[in-house]
């Protein structure tokens, strides 16, 4: 694992028990960890967590967003897929995005999926609703583009929008036809499927690798991904890769069938390999029966699978159901359970994250869990070590965790595997209780557990009070500042930022733009350091100079304000127009939580409004910027050191205001309310359609409402809209408007 990653101190707490602050902290930490794992999985083909671990990590993230909707925005990972394509390959834009699937881990979740589909479509229980069920292959997603029946391009999924061009490599896979055969082949079709490696072929490949003194692969998925993403197609040709087709993207003039199973049958007729274990069923019981059947056969299959995928069979119903965030409403992946293993804790180390959180990590005797070698496990926080849960309750039957203990490790949703129990009868005689440090192991500042003034409850995590004088926190801020979506200075990535900090060349963002001047005055020139030369140093200085002018939204994003991702940075940039205006608004804002501070003796002129002052209301009224984001912005600029960092940076950099964005649909950017009985679509379908067109759907009418779509039986909302002068149209007029 990467050192100094943010902790997840509340992981042992149910999401329903998290406070808003705890949820915000964990959401931010999860966002960083998931993005890191996406890069390892999709770009490096070297995941450090199992699929079950990753899936449950995603589930935790999405559950937090479901309970705290203000945390969800356009930058949320729940709206994203995969990771950006590698720079090693040419990029290919997917005409139809390659999305991922929502996951289910229990029978109840599958039954709820079926019920949810019925509710969305307003189908009676007696109405037939067919599904397909197929094994979920553990490989690398790939899109094959055929034009006139001829394979013209192949691409990985990448970030779902664009992937890597692997055409030359895919042409070496024997199972993938260069030309489709048979009747009914569409003029253009993007075949979606999975490139994988069979178990026997994987073992044989690893034997050859070991014999040749080359690194072996951890599992068949890594072997398949690494083999497909080779720069030399001849290496790919030498690897026994295979392929299953199961979906499609663009299809002109249309897909070769009216249902999922008809289209997949057509794939088989065209000469594409399809999975023989795919079936069609008509209820949840049929789905679960097939899941158990495949689970029983899993060990005997010649390839790895990690679950079963269920899809609504009718393409017409799929179209009605549409998509939500990063996945379709009409499909779900029913995943197999995670695995456990027993090992020994050799040491407990403390890592310090960007927010100062001290995270205990168990260093383990390496053990294989779920096909991945595990040597680290999270211990969450000091209470978890002491067998105390998030609400003060006893966990693990009151057995604490000590160095030397034999423990059961599980890969089931944590950032790194977690210790779930201690084998007490194997505890060494000399093992002593672990003493959690009260000082930061990096900067030696005091580490404290804060107390919530409202609840009086002590925070689960102990934090370093050193702030930016703590190298661990300062380095993380610098690494974020130079990241791809921030200043993105060529030649100055996260690794170089860390090194420059260690060499005392930079301590805060503004120092980057003073680097050349300092280098000229220094006796120890950058070009003389290991890994650098005169040309590379000059190229870096030129790249830094080119970033002295930067878009305002990138500048705001680079500051690393909690909850302010790329999209929220754009929203703030468009609204305020300058860093100074944003800073002044943050300083002048009076938050609702501060209203309680005024006593009866407080002069009326100084008392604050219960809903916050006008500056606060203006910020929270920005489309997409709620109270959680606004509070983070206010707290950032109220911290004197942060203001100083920004002021110094503004001496070196000139942020440029954003240009206005043109609307792309008649309702783009407008607030729409639906009321009454809709006859041509369900309420969920109406909301999904409006959001796809760029509108914001509200549940009530207010002065901010731009349009009310009223069906038969519209009542109080229609009356209020008329009183406010809100434009009102019928359902038919809505379809005329949006086409």
Curated annotation (Swiss-Prot):
Gene Ontology CC terms, in alphabetical order: cytosol
Chain segments carrying region Disordered: 1-29, 592-612
GO MF entries: DNA ligase (NAD+) activity; metal ion binding
Gene Ontology BP annotations: DNA repair; DNA replication
Record-annotated active site: 136
EC number per UniProt: 6.5.1.2
Keyword Metal-binding in annotation: yes
Domain of life assignment: Bacteria
Stretches assigned to the BRCT domain: 662-739
Positions of Zn(2+) binding: 440, 443, 464, 470
Disulphide-bridged cysteine pairs: none
Residues engaged in binding NAD(+): 51-55, 100-101, 134, 157, 194, 311, 335
Coiled coil: none
Keywords on record: DNA damage, DNA repair, DNA replication, Ligase, Magnesium, Manganese, Metal-binding, NAD, Zinc
SUPFAM superfamilies assigned to the protein according to its UniProt record, in alphabetical order: BRCT domain, DNA ligase/mRNA capping enzyme, catalytic domain, Nucleic acid-binding proteins, RuvA domain 2-like
Cofactor: Mg(2+); Mn(2+)
The keyword Zinc-finger is annotated on this UniProt entry: no
Signal peptide per UniProt: none
Catalytic reactions of this protein: NAD(+) + (deoxyribonucleotide)n-3'-hydroxyl + 5'-phospho-(deoxyribonucleotide)m = (deoxyribonucleotide)n+m + AMP + beta-nicotinamide D-nucleotide
Family the entry assigns: Belongs to the NAD-dependent DNA ligase family. LigA subfamily.
Function per UniProt: DNA ligase that catalyzes the formation of phosphodiester linkages between 5'-phosphoryl and 3'-hydroxyl groups in double-stranded DNA using NAD as a coenzyme and as the energy source for the reaction. It is essential for DNA replication and repair of damaged DNA.
Protein name: DNA ligase
UniProt lineage: Bacteria, Pseudomonadati, Pseudomonadota, Alphaproteobacteria, Hyphomicrobiales
Gene that produces this protein: ligA
